[in-house]
């Protein structure tokens, strides 16, 4: 795969927007939760109270999705949470943290594409395990139902 540097930080401001309810997107995109303790967590599906990242292609979408997944898992946005009852993160803070991480990644010889496939495989396995767990819970309920409803 051709190596690209996604360092154009000024372009991030035009790619991350506040999602408006009911709006549909034709280009590759993902959502970033902006309220609660999970602020900054990326989602491939729509979530309420979110920003949307509008990518030019799937490679760019996947790159930024996994970058934000790493930022969320390392809790790099926690110091930027505002609010007392319901905490939230501002769009500008998300962009600033993402720019800082991109500058640090792009300054070294590390290639994100080296780990992107492994991260995608881990996500696939995690989804598979969640489905297996859901099936086991349904089986458990069915067994209880069969046992308790038997006359």
Mark where each language-model region is.
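DNA target-recognition domains and sequence-specific DNA-contacting regions of bacterial/archaeal
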Residues: 1-102
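Amphipathic alpha-helical segments
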Residues: 64, 95-145
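Hydrophobic/aromatic-lined pockets within catalytic cores
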Residues: 148
